[in-house]
Amino acid sequence: MRSRDIRRKYGQNYLTDKSVLFKMADAISPTSSDNFLEIGPGLGALTEQINKDDINIIAIDIDSENTEILKNKFTGPANFQFLTDDILKYKIENDRQRIVGNLPYNISTQIILKLIDSCENCLLYTSPSPRD
């Protein structure tokens, strides 16, 4: 995985601990034809863990450099979309999604509140946030 500087203005925190990634992927347990919305995919560590041929992933990152890295890293599957967007402004179209991510610390509460308002039938899987 290509490393790059973390941009604090975006609240970036790249999840790199393999044991945490494996535990998250095990808990998420992707199944055939799942629809995922990944918030803040960063460099794709979690994306790589849940990657299966028959799932659909929309990965949204506010950082265009991350989006370009992901587009180059995951070149095969047509069922992946990598978007540069602000999740707080993004319109969630499908409320039957499994939402995953290592949420940006500085807006994690706002993201969760948006999801509560936008998604009646979504399942959220996220990494733990540090204590304030």
Residue ranges and their predicted role:
Residues 1-127, 131:
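Catalytic cores of RNA-modifying enzymes
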